[in-house]
């Protein structure tokens, strides 16, 4: 099952984490600070294909493999696909309703499937509900949120892969 490493603001050895990913995996470079996001993208470039979160200008500038959009910008996918047809375009989603607007995307990251420390207080979908949602999606769905080596086996085959933060950091 392909893996997606989602970076966050913590100071971690993201390059080491990216090097450990199996072939076919990607890294989503996230972060609020544009200078830090640029520095991280430059560090990771060439280690694994990169999707830049919510920053199409940076994605184009560094020659990223694509763009990751927040759920609220999912409808922009067709625009970015037309402008950069070679890009992989993904988005986050948190409900079946959100996934119904995902037709122009290559994949969606559905979250949170399990309880997660990165979004304290967010109510998990649960594996059963998440599997139902993923099974009705018009595009491939990756499970995100609290996914670990211990609970990944509880995910249904309706998922195309796993996206994670903490469980992929060395």
What do these predicted regions represent?
Residues 1-77, 81-107, 122, 132-139, ...:
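Conserved N-terminal beta1-alpha1 strand-loop-helix module at the mouth
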Residues 106-114:
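Non-cysteine beta-strand/loop elements that form the S-adenosyl-L-methionine
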Residues 115-122:
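Short, glycine/charged-rich beta-strand-loop motifs at protein surfaces that mediate ligand recognition
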Residues 116, 140-141:
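Short, flexible coil/turn micro-motifs enriched in small/turn-prone residues
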Residues 125-129:
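Short, glycine-/small-residue-rich phosphate/pyrophosphate-handling segment
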Residues 143-146:
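Alpha-helical hinge/cap motifs
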């Amino acid at each position: 099952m392909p893996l997606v490493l989602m970076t966050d603001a913590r100071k971690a050895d993201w390059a080491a984490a990216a090097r450990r990913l199996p072939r076919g995996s990607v890294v989503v470079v996230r972060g609020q600070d544009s200078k830090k996001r640029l520095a991280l993208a430059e560090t990771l470039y060439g280690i694994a294909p990169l999707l830049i979160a919510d920053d199409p200008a940076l994605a184009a500038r560094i020659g990223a493999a694509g763009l990751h959009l927040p759920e609220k910008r999912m409808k922009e996918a067709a625009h970015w696909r037309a402008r950069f047809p070679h890009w992989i375009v993904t988005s986050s989603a948190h409900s079946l309703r959100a996934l119904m607007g995902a037709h122009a995307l290559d994949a969606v990251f559905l979250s949170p499937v399990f309880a997660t420390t990165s979004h304290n207080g967010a109510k998990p979908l649960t594996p059963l509900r998440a599997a139902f949602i993923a099974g009705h999606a018009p595009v491939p769905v990756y499970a995100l949120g609290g996914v670990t080596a211990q609970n990944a086996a509880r995910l249904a085959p309706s998922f195309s892969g796993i996206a994670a933060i903490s469980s992929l950091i060395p």
